[in-house]
């Protein structure tokens, strides 16, 4: 039979207090006695001799029974002069700490207090610190991920901004001013396209001859605008409309970009409000161009012709006014008449339509010429004009390539943007706002990235502050465990004692 002296005593830490009470090692009402002891300790530590070791025992740690024993040992050296012939000390310091030790040893109060500290550390303090450290680590991972997302997002939005600027042909330093500056180069680009269209005379004559041959009767001239461009190039709308070159050309001026409003100023806008007079509180709201939602009607029926229509036709009315304002003396090109054929939308669309019409004809003719090996096709063109019979498929394809190049230039995205800028200054504002929005989003994401870096450092600093506390708490908890196991072992004739479930 195994000697029971060597059988270990295993005690679950969570049940340690109940175990001590059940085996009558301590009193059930030990907490009230511990409160009394704590009060006496708080009073006693107010009057202590100067000693480095005592100062270390009293600094920042929970003073328990074994600390008190060490303090008494130290006081035996500092208070040796107060010892009488009976071996007792007359020093009040020594008396106070000896009384504290006596109270601790009554009903083994020190043991149950140490056990209470151990249970609290194991069940609450240590898990709480570990949870806080784990939270800091998780926050660092989250902030690191968000930092990478913010950096990638900022780079992507910045790349989109510069890519869009590249599409518009600007650098992005001053979007609005650069967009308006692009329009200044538009006439020279359109002049080059007009010069390229002047080489289409042969293709136009070929188309005209084919139409006359197929219809078997003289017809009106085809492609009037392309035919007009041959000698005149990209002239003004006035010259195209009237047939005479204007003596004066008054081109519409583009609006200069407004001054940027300072961040610390409020832009109240210009509502055209008159100042309030000192004698009254009347404010004039007679602002042209603003629809106040008020229907103004004259009392007289005869005034109906002068009534202003604020309805959905306001835009059409505005266009009518603008066109009316272009009336100018003879020989003066003003307003839309001052624009070139390729600048004015109506004539530009007609120009593109005629280019496409000519391209389709030549493409179809090239297909027909590749299939004219049969006798029927040859016989059909025996009576055709010489200009039709003298063409080759390669010549047709060459002319088609020239036309496609001109159409591609006029319908390119760059020129479409420039045409919209020329037609509507509001388009410049929309494009500017869109591009600036991308840049602002990039800046906001960059700020978010910096904020995530800052928060990551804060979480790292918090973790660095918690880890030493956890290490110290684990060390003290292991110390408490050894003290409790040794004390209980003494009570059972040296049997080994194991406190289970501490995980420290």
Swiss-Prot record:
Positions of the UniProt region annotated as RPL10a-binding domain (RBD): 353-368
Cell compartment(s), UniProt: Endoplasmic reticulum membrane; Cytoplasm; Nucleus; Cytoplasm, Cytoskeleton, Microtubule organizing center, Centrosome
InterPro entries xrefs: CDK5RAP3 (IPR008491)
Chief site of localization: endoplasmic reticulum
Region annotated Required for interaction with UFL1 and mediates interaction with CHEK1, chain positions: 268-504
Domain of life where this protein originates: Eukaryota
Function: Substrate adapter of E3 ligase complexes mediating ufmylation, the covalent attachment of the ubiquitin-like modifier UFM1 to substrate proteins, and which is involved in various processes, such as ribosome recycling and reticulophagy (also called ER-phagy). As part of the UREL complex, plays a key role in ribosome recycling by promoting mono-ufmylation of RPL26/uL24 subunit of the 60S ribosome.
Free-text note on domains in this protein's UniProt record: The shuffled ATG8-binding motifs mediate interaction with both ATG8 family protein and UFM1.
Family to which the UniProt record says this protein belongs: Belongs to the CDK5RAP3 family.
Protein name in UniProt: CDK5 regulatory subunit-associated protein 3
Protein's organism: Rattus norvegicus
Record lineage: Eukaryota, Metazoa, Chordata, Craniata, Vertebrata
